[in-house]
């Protein structure tokens, strides 16, 4: 078989099993995110480029691709997320059209660009969830390109999908083999009594985290965003990689926990808060039965750590505990988490801004050598920060990825420019590295001293701001939202501090002064604040005669 640029190979597949099931809990979360980003949710598609072993023929590569599709139910599942039931259907036969792309010299960079083109459009309901391409050059097939619908697989699931191509790829697959369990099996387990029990336990843990966290990690008002609004900035640091690994070894925690602590410290300092919360992407693969499933099991787990003392070691232990519990929490029904969140928001009086994320892909620790201050400083001088192109879509204010490229730590950050200025994002990345480096070179420093070394400026409140329930509340914004939601009520806001704890009081104009007046429905007020990250429901409504407006 010879390949020509622009042609499409037709790979016919046939498999014995054709099954249906509801979406798994992980798929439900992804389906909601896709709906939120409509009509342009292609940014969620996974994309990969894998180098082909030299000397292979095109028909050998095509045969391996056929074997992958036939072995992986996820690669031949059709999705209809809005259906009342059986939202995923595994097909038994069909045709996969493989794009052929020719280059004079195929490089990894050009392969990634071609994979991005494959992933550049959303998957339709009648599309197979995998697009495959072959990049060739004068020597023959050079790269297999994959674009995967995120409903079909997450990052780790894609690794096990490409395991089926191991005989034609140069990649190392010595860490095991895929599970015989498929997403349909996962969905059936989740609807079982055992699955419902595990989901209920997980939701109880998440409710405790949601009850502790600040309303938002960036208590600020939006500004006119740049175009494009959402932008990627990446830092590549050898010094950061080495120091992160050394801190993990020194304190007996995971590298992800160290990254979580450093990012939490930066955000809490920026915001002037004593707690930090992050949504952590958890693969749900701690169990032996789910470790190697080809599918989308990843869910976002809320974490919250206190940053109210001077001990950096304590912060590392808290982050390690948060990551440990998040990893072992287990799967949970996505709709159940939405209900828990609404219950907590109603109780606390404000909508939670859960748009700050950490996705760590630091799976294999880097060997940590003995500290060498001169080498660390030399490597830190080579750290690079650069902005990436492209028009991104997101629902996040800040999404941070931790990856390793050989001995380089890559910190990729997606920011919403309505809340984060480009110069700030760069400064926060540098601060992240600075905390890691300084914690290694000067282990006696406290957390406060470490973040002070970065030069990042902390939030400074004015008279318009008040800290209530570990969150910054903007009084003018809250008043404006209440006036819009309660048009028949004339009121102003006041802050009381009985027992030292601040509370928000709405003083309502009434002929009868000094009495508590009936408050509007908690649900009505919280919904009126939806989309506002710096407003809250008053704790009390008190009547007062005369004009009460500011």
What is each residue range found by the language model?
Residues 1-37, 63-106, 126-128, 182-229:
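Short amphipathic alpha-helices and their capping loops
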Residues 9-18, 54-70, 86-127, 314-323, ...:
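A short, small/polar-residue-rich loop/turn motif at beta-strand boundaries
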Residues 9-14, 18-20, 40-60, 125-145, ...:
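Gly/Ser/Thr-rich phosphate-binding loops and adjoining beta-strand/alpha-helix segments
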Residues 14, 26, 101-105, 130-185, ...:
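Active-site-proximal acidic secondary-structure segment that organizes catalysis
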Residues 18, 23, 29, 42-49, ...:
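Flexible, Gly/Pro-enriched loop and linker segments at secondary-structure and domain junctions
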Residues 38-46, 73-74, 140-141, 194-200, ...:
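His-Asp-centered acyl/peptidyl-transfer active-site segments
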Residues 72, 76, 162-163, 274-281, ...:
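Extended, hydrophobic beta-loop-alpha segments that form or line the acyl/peptidyl-thioester binding
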